[in-house]
């Protein structure tokens, strides 16, 4: 596979006029020379003298001109093609036989020949092989992933492994049919989303008339005879708490955001100054999509609720249950701040009447009115003149808030 990319090299296309590019290069050249001079002067320095040079280096680095707008692009340069070899035990310092461009041998018939030279458009040829009708694996894998996104479990429960070490499909005929639909639809995902959302399987409720009988036959719900109950994922949990508290910033686009964290976490970084908190506090309440993700600094909320750690590919998220989750939702800094904001919102929108407070809290957090038992418990709690913040925190810990049925 790597041989298909052996001749590929970056060639970004700068969008600025030539005169602007020349001016940018001149300014960058002067600043880079200054940085080089400071680095040479600070060698061997210690203490206050070193700190002074570090400050100069930071100031000089900040003077570097911002990158010019450009389009990321690549080109094929066969004269610079990198030779690809088999590696002994995967070590690049121990190359063995040279190999040509060819799909993975495990996916090809026995005796399939190597390609001696690169094709004219190697990446295009690889893409064509990936979607050829002779390779049904791609469509099956993609259809299975789309199914997993909606139902929490793929028809093949190991989305990254369709081989002998993976689990067998629970409904192979359905998987083949979905794969054929995907290909027939021009490999477009929107028709697949529409197909699944209009299906009777998607429209099922959690409670089934034959719940006990079906549970005896299929307790893991592999055949999806009812909808599966699932907990909100880490990002969904955070965004939902922000929305209920009235703090969610729906701003679109822009760079990733660094939010405030404990100093104990930033001190673990090689350079703690890398964690630059956004100056505008409203940016801290952006959707979790915009939170910066660092492998060596895990946000407590994300870590507790099984967000991927980005060390390895994550085809399927697990949903664990452990004590730190309860601690995060009751004593965590983020949960406490959201409870305060939620209580302030309830006071503003529902006043001090216990019945109105309860109704508004349930509507915001669960999308429904409280049942008789819930209303009675809430009324009993609020009649004790306890802090409204504690009531708001309890509502944010309801199963009806944290789980989707």
What is each PLM-predicted segment?
Residues 292-298:
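Hydrophobic/basic alpha-helical segments
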Residues 28-283, 302, 308-320, 330-389, ...:
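Primarily short, surface-exposed interaction patches in extracytoplasmic proteins
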Residues 289-290, 307-308:
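C-terminal, charged and often intrinsically disordered regions of DNA end-processing helicases
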Residues 6, 91, 294:
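Residues that form or immediately flank small-molecule/cofactor binding pockets and catalytic motifs
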């Amino acid at each position: 596979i790597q041989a298909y990319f052996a001749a590929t090299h970056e060639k970004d296309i700068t969008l600025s006029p030539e005169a602007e590019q020349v001016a940018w290069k001149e300014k960058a050249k002067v600043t880079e020379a200054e940085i080089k001079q400071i680095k040479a002067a600070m060698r061997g320095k210690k203490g206050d003298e070193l700190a002074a040079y570090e400050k100069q280096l930071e100031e000089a680095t900040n003077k570097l001109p911002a990158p010019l707008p450009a389009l990321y692009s690549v080109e094929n340069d066969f004269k610079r093609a990198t030779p690809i070899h088999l590696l002994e035990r995967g070590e690049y310092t121990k190359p063995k036989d040279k190999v040509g461009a060819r799909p993975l041998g495990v996916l090809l018939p026995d005796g399939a020949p190597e390609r001696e030279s690169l094709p004219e458009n190697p990446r295009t040829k690889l893409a064509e092989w990936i979607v050829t009708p002779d390779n049904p694996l791609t469509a099956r894998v993609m259809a299975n992933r789309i199914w997993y996104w909606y139902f929490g479990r793929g028809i093949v429960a190991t989305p990254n492994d369709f081989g002998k070490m993976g689990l067998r499909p629970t409904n192979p005929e359905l998987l083949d049919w979905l794969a054929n639909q995907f290909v027939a639809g021009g490999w477009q995902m929107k028709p697949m989303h529409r197909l699944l959302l209009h299906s009777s399987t998607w429209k099922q409720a959690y409670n089934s008339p034959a719940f006990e009988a079906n549970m005896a036959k299929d307790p893991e719900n592999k055949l999806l005879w009812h909808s599966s109950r699932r907990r909100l994922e880490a990002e969904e949990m955070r965004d939902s708490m922000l929305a209920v508290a009235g703090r969610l910033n729906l701003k679109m686009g822009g760079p990733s955001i660094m939010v405030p964290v404990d100093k104990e976490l930033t001190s673990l970084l090689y350079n703690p100054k890398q964690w630059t908190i956004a100056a505008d506090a409203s940016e801290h309440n952006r959707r979790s999509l915009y939170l910066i993700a660092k492998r060596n600094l895990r946000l407590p909320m994300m870590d507790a609720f099984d967000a991927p750690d980005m060390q390895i590919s994550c085809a399927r998220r697990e949903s664990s249950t452990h004590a730190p989750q309860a601690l995060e939702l009751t004593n965590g800094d983020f949960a406490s701040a959201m409870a305060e904001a939620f209580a302030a919102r309830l006071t503003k929108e529902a006043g001090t009447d216990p019945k109105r407070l309860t109704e508004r809290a349930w509507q915001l957090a669960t999308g429904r009115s409280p049942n008789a038992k819930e209303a009675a418990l809430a009324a009993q709690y609020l009649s004790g003149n306890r802090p409204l913040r504690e009531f708001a925190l309890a509502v944010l810990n309801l199963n009806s808030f944290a789980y989707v049925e």
